[in-house]
Regions:
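Long, structured ligand/cofactor-binding scaffold of large enzymes
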Residues: 1
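Histidine/acidic-residue-rich, glycine-tolerant segments that coordinate divalent metal ions
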Residues: 4, 9-21, 27-28, 33, ...
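Alpha-helix C-terminal capping segments
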Residues: 35-45, 260-262
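Membrane-embedded catalytic cores of phosphoryl/pyrophosphoryl-handling enzymes
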Residues: 38, 49-52, 177
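Short, well-ordered alpha-helices that flank and scaffold nucleotide-derived cofactor binding pockets
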Residues: 38, 42, 70, 305-308
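Residues in and immediately flanking transmembrane alpha helices
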Residues: 39-40, 97, 131, 268
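Hydrophobic residues in beta-strands and at strand termini
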Residues: 41, 57, 112-114, 181, ...
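Metal-dependent amide/peptide-bond hydrolase catalytic core
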Residues: 133-315
Length: 315
């Protein structure tokens, strides 16, 4: 889960692989889970039940969790629990927010088929470039006019390619974009609207469209009961006044969502920004990303504490 970023931090644990670095904290996640494993093994005789510990790959591309699920590694699991470091939260604080926390992530490609002609006779062709530009503009109306202002919806086009030469009506065009939503219902409605609008716009100018979709991850919706259980542990680890229960949802995705769909669960966000230290406050996916390592102790205590507490209360 390293990212294709050249690390610029000058630290002993700087990436040894040119052009890639851990710029989102997945190395910290693995370290904290290993620490929790050590505690759990040392106290295995005091634990009533079975604990499945997943060191999951491929979160950054959105398919790792489904590989674990498809292989039955979370079958018959009563609770799921995970944690992610956050440079937006001060060290010593934990977000255990029920409900939507992260958006679904869908990638799409729209191909527009037109017909080439000389630019002096546009009526003899079908301008795929013009059609594509109208699709880009019109699908923004999904957010502005077809979605409730109370719903968090994002439709973004990041790539558009069309045309062969300045004096030829473009015979084809392609665009790539993403859809981000916080609920399955809004997600379904938005995807349907994109296809409907693009198809109708293309038909209006004599063109045709085709679609490709990739479903990277579902919306991450924390189970309320699981959050309350985790909060009881966090009360001991960091104190009740350091528990955040109203973190604003993010439109970035996380495939921890897939586990929570299978069994009730909670995904917490551990503060990794040391107060007064700008280096640990750098945004994720940045070449200077780093953490306050004190946050690892919090993560270790939460992982081990929640597992032991839940199993012993439900033995």
């Amino acid at each position: 889960d390293a990212l294709p970023i050249h690390e610029k931090n000058e630290v002993s644990y700087k990436s040894q692989n040119e052009g890639v670095m851990h710029a989102c904290g997945h190395d910290a996640h693995a370290a904290s889970l290993l620490g929790a494993c050590r505690i759990l093994v040392n106290h295995k005789d005091d634990i009533y039940g079975k604990i499945v510990i997943n060191f999951q790959q491929a979160e950054e591309i959105g398919y790792g969790a489904r590989q674990f699920i498809d292989r039955g590694l979370v079958k018959n699991v009563d609770r799921t629990f995970g944690m992610h470091v956050s440079s937006a939260i001060e060290t010593g604080y934990i977000s255990l927010t029920p409900g939507p926390n992260n958006a679904s992530v869908d990638w799409f490609k729209i191909k527009v088929k037109g017909k080439a002609a000389h630019v002096s006779t546009p009526d003899a062709g079908v301008d795929a470039l013009y059609i594509a530009s109208q699709i880009v503009c019109n699908i923004q109306g999904i957010v502005a006019r077809l979605s409730s202002p109370m719903d968090n919806v994002l439709v973004g086009i990041g790539c558009l390619e069309a045309g062969q030469a300045y004096n030829i009506v473009a015979p084809s065009a392609e665009m790539e974009g993403t859809v981000r939503c916080l609920t399955p219902e809004v997600r379904k409605k938005t995807k349907e609207a994109i296809e409907r609008i693009a198809t109708n716009v293309a038909a209006s100018y004599g063109g045709e469209v085709s679609f490709e979709w990739k479903d990277f991850t579902s919306p991450l919706i924390n189970d309320k009961g699981s959050c309350l259980e985790a909060a009881q542990v966090a009360d001991v680890v960091v104190g009740a006044d350091h528990i955040i229960t109203d973190r604003k949802p993010a439109l970035g995705g996380d495939d921890m969502a897939e586990y929570i769909i299978v069994s009730p669960g909670c995904y917490g966000f551990v503060g990794s920004h040391k107060k007064g230290d700008s280096k640990t406050g750098v945004a994720h996916h940045n070449e200077y990303f780093d953490i306050d390592e004190d946050c690892l102790l919090v993560s270790v205590a939460m992982y081990a504490g929640y597992a032991i507490d839940y199993l012993n209360k439900n033995k």
